């Protein structure tokens, strides 16, 4: 393994969350505990080896929870059909953000609540502050995004950066 790419998917199984789930009905019905177990272990393995990590959508949530963070288990207004394919969610970016996009195609019903250890917010939704991009401090390449960069060419720089890091780990 030269790096780790965590993709989107169903909600994290409650057994892996570091918080109470007062209303289990807000969680997806297609949770996959085996996938979750594998992903949490893969995060720990990648971190212990200093490998590049790119986490997307659910992947960001796994990355955050794996580092001790918690989630907002059901948010309103971020899972609208028009947000899935078009870049409609205005962002605010931190001054030192590694990748900046004015708008993203964010569509999800969960998000980061409490940040995991050593994560730093790089971008958040302009209208409600939902965290959309984080990076792992003092780590060669640990980037996680709530939006879907695989859906548009405007995010190519993010993938090029990740793949360049993968190539450098082969040497």
Where are these regions (language model features)?
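Amide-donor transfer/coupling interface in amidating biosynthetic enzymes
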Residues: 1-7, 35-51, 76-171
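Catalytic nucleophile loop
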Residues: 60
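Structured adenosyl-cofactor binding patch, chiefly the S-adenosyl-L-methionine
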Residues: 63-64
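Conserved G/P- and acidic residue-centered "switch" motifs that form tight phosphate/ATP-binding loops
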Residues: 57
């Amino acid at each position: 393994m030269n790096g780790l790419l965590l993709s989107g998917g169903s909600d994290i199984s409650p057994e892996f969350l570091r918080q109470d789930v007062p209303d289990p009905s807000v969680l997806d019905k297609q949770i996959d505990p085996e996938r979750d177990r594998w992903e949490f272990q893969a995060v720990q393995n990648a971190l212990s080896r200093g490998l590049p990590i790119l986490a997307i959508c659910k992947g960001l949530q796994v990355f955050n929870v794996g580092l001790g963070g918690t989630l907002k288990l059901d948010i309103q207004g971020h899972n609208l059909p028009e947000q899935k394919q078009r870049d409609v969610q205005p962002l605010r970016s931190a001054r030192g953000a590694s990748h900046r996009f004015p708008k993203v195609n964010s569509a999800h019903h969960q998000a980061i609540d409490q940040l995991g250890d050593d994560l730093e917010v790089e971008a958040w939704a302009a209208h409600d502050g939902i965290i959309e991009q984080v990076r792992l401090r003092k780590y060669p390449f640990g980037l996680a995004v709530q939006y879907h960069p695989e859906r548009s060419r405007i995010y190519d720089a993010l993938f090029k950066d990740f793949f360049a890091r993968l190539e450098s780990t082969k040497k």
